[in-house]
Amino acid sequence: MKIIIFGLGNFGMSLALSLTETGNEVIGVDKQMDKVNLIKDKISLAICMDSTNEFAYEALPLKDADKVIVAIGENEGAAIITTAIIKKLCNAKIIS
């Protein structure tokens, strides 16, 4: 299963690692490069981008994703905007 996780904080990072260990293809997305660097060798792909910028989504394989998880916890506004953009751009199951 191809899963994209937005937000690589404590929850998002541990979820990405667990889902990878169970055989899923996981793409992790965060706006902080240090978090991307921490996980980039442990999951399929890690991308540094601002998920509130709709134009940044061109780099993501959203159409191929089975599930999209929004794990942005510290910025509620960013989580809502990210969820709205994802809903507009793909038909994957969204967990937010």
Language-model regions: role of each:
Residues M1-S96:
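Cytosolic regulatory regions of ion transport systems
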